[in-house]
């Protein structure tokens, strides 16, 4: 039997392969040990903190008249530098993580009580908070540690760094439609960056707002985070007049403008997460049943009360009826023939909002649905046809389970109609033609653009979530949360052991020549000296 002789290259390859495998295993073990040890340390500190908080008297629910005083207290807490070090921030994030994890079911039940939303979506909202907090904990060092950058010749033998600096006391104003996600994720981001936080939650999601305020009082030291949930407009007015260092607002464009004006008067930054009339554009090349199902699903989440929901849809004229029928069948498949009896279909938040939905339906050509029960805040999933750009349903964001279907012949028609409500928070395209998708990208300015699905881009922490102009200012989620709640600060470390006289007066012809040569040579950088 002839022996097989390995060549030198085979031997080297095998050695390299085995070495890489061993190194990978060691790295995995190292990361696991680091996480376990770090988690154990945070857990120990959390238990100590919990014991301290248990001995404290429960705080009285915050009243809007107290906001000015609380803002002052939180600013004083920030000035002590208690959250200056990353370890202190990790401890607070772990407290927040445990708060949500330990009370996951209670928070889910409160959301369901407020919004009549299906159980799965309530749990998914709480899980999204847990995942985001874990992302922040895991990447705190990566994104917030001081980083060295190259140094220019003028700083010869010095060192240059960029560090992320917190703003101070952050005011987070959250809405009712996703009361856990849209309040706790911004709070987690602000705390991760070293800020103290005042959280103004919505009175319309009273069960969730009250529970989260009570849990924050129990789990998070009051010098870092305080909540208010009892009032609406009065509290927002107080927030605008208080001396916060940063505003983070999610809600309507009208209130967003008030927040932005207040921030501008104080010369402090603001992030505004607003909304808009998000279009969907369906192309003939797509699987129509799949596209219709995904649009119907988006329109059904929280009964259409989500800022990234499909607001209206553009469909080629030749397939309009087929598309409408497919959307109708999807609604029936999701919630049955009588959607009012479904435990999974949500309710409109207030009677006045349900009344507004009825006015839209009454002035439209209904293809399917149209039932409204104002007393029970129920609006049936509804499809509108023969829609014109000046109809009531196209005046402003619908924020409900009503889907206007607009026929088109060319994409240029679509682009002209979208210009009536520019810069939507999201634009959804359904096509198998990549050239068509790129054409839409080039012609519609939006916070996000997604082909062949909707909304689920929010689950990706590697993508920014935010609008543009009318749909918002700024973004967050994942690494972008660190960018939002902290600012880059230049840090330069020089010395006196060597003095470069080229910059001193009187300025000689030699200095002019030397400086000119340095500029002309295009080598102004000295890396990491």
UniProtKB/Swiss-Prot annotation:
GO terms for biological process: aldehyde metabolic process. The keyword Oxidoreductase applies. Its EC number is 1.2.1.3. NAD(+) binds at residues 251-256. It catalyses: an aldehyde + NAD(+) + H2O = a carboxylate + NADH + 2 H(+). It is an enzyme of class 1 (oxidoreductase). The active site is at residues 273, 307. One of its GO terms (molecular function) is aldehyde dehydrogenase (NAD+) activity. It holds the Pfam family Aldedh. GO terms for cellular component: cytoplasm. Keywords: NAD, Oxidoreductase. PANTHER family: ALDEHYDE DEHYDROGENASE, ALDEHYDE DEHYDROGENASE TYPE III, ISOFORM Q. Belongs to the aldehyde dehydrogenase family. This is Aldehyde dehydrogenase 1.
